[in-house]
Every structure is written in C-alpha cells, then in structure tokens.
Amino acid sequence: MFNFLRNLFSSDPEKKEERSRLRAQKKHDQRIASKQVLSDEWHPVNFPYQATIFNIQRANKGYGSTCQISVRYIENEQYKDMIYLVNPKVKSFSFSNYHDIKPEDVADAPVFKDVWPEIEPYFTGKNVITYYADAHLRALQATLQKNHISEPEMHFIDLYDYFCERHDSWESFSLDYVAEKLDLDSYPSAKHPKATLDTITEILELMYEKRPGILRKLLGVKAKRK
C-alpha cells in the first residue's frame, strides 16, 4: 500500500508529465463527446410525418467550411440524432467564439466526404427542414460542391420563410426570438446543437397541433378523406 501511494504521489517528472497528459486527454475526449452524437436511440415525438431537420456550423465565413453538421431524422413518431464534427481543412476558425468549436476539436475528425455517406440517406428523397436556409442550406450546398458531391434531390422547407410570410409584424425572425414568441420549452444554441434541433422539433409539433393544414401543405402531404 505504501509503495502504491508513493507511486501515486511521486514527484518523478516523467510520471507527473504522464498523469498530466492523461488528464488532458480525458478532458479533450469529454469535450469531443459533448459535441457529437454518433449512435443514438429512437425517441418518441408528437409528429406523425417524415422530416429531416439539419443545422450546420462553419469554421469561418466561407460557406464550404462546415465543421459540424447536426441531423435529426423523424419518422413514425420517433426521432434519432446524428451530430458529427467535421474537419473542414481550413486554417481560419474565426467563428469559434460563436459555436465553441476549435481547430483542435476537429483535428482528428473525419472530412465531410467521409461523413456524408452516413447521413445522405436522410436527405435524398426526404422532407428536409432547417431554419434560415441562407446559412444552413447554402453551407450544405457549398460543402457538397467543395467535395465534388452531387446535391441530393429533396423536398426542402425553410421555416424562416414560413414565419416571415405569416408574421410580418414581428420585430425579428431569429430562431431565438421565435422560440420566445411561441413560448417554447426549448431554446436554440450554437454551442449546443441538440438544443437547436429540439427547438425546431418543437415548432413542428406546435404546427401539427395548431396549423395542421398549413403543415401538410408545406410537407406536400395530402389530407386524408373522411
């Protein structure tokens, strides 16, 4: 026991350095794990239609600099999440203060062309939804083009456009403002991608409850005949 304690609290420089390295590695691994969801289970949701919600974070102002892509797939009143860090292979990470993704976080992450096959089935031929397409759809398109990948055929819906068209008296159309205006339980955060996915999901659930006809029209779903 004495030898064990002596080794544990040893002042040996090499052992101290190794302990420090292991602590740093553990902290890094925990940080990376908090920014990804690589294997999710199905969760219940009050939404009967198919939908793919996605959100992208970029390393910098370049639309092809995707460093994180978050996807929530909804089907049969269930959803599962897929959140990937992506190595954008860029030098500038000027948006780090916004989303808290740093170069070291993506240093060992896969590049987009290796992530895309994992999520492509949830885009091709699907109802694909985001909030503010000028940021997220544009980033997806630019990143696909950068990696010489064809853009999939999909039925795209921008909820930002929906609120702009129907609530033109509102002071703002940012997602956080909409969340407050609708008194949602969830609140979007660039640093917490699941929170943003939750917010958009809650909007869809609310539309299903309060505006089912408009929702079906957006999704291209025909009303059932009585």
Segments predicted by a language model, with ranges:
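A short acidic, often aromatic-flanked loop/helix-cap motif at beta-alpha or helix-coil junctions
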Residues: 91, 162-165, 195
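Short Asp/Glu-rich motifs
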Residues: 115, 163, 198-199
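Acidic, Mg2+-coordinating catalytic module of metal-dependent nucleases/exonucleases
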Residues: 127-134, 139-144, 174-226
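Residue-level "edge-of-site" marker
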Residues: 109, 157, 192
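Acidic two-metal-ion nuclease catalytic site recognized across multiple nuclease folds
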Residues: 2-43, 181, 201-226
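Short, structured loop/turn "capping" segments at alpha-beta junctions
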Residues: 151-155, 213-214
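Short alpha-helix plus adjacent loop in nuclease-associated cores
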Residues: 157-174
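Conserved non-catalytic scaffold segment of RNase H-like nuclease domains
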Residues: 35-153, 176-188
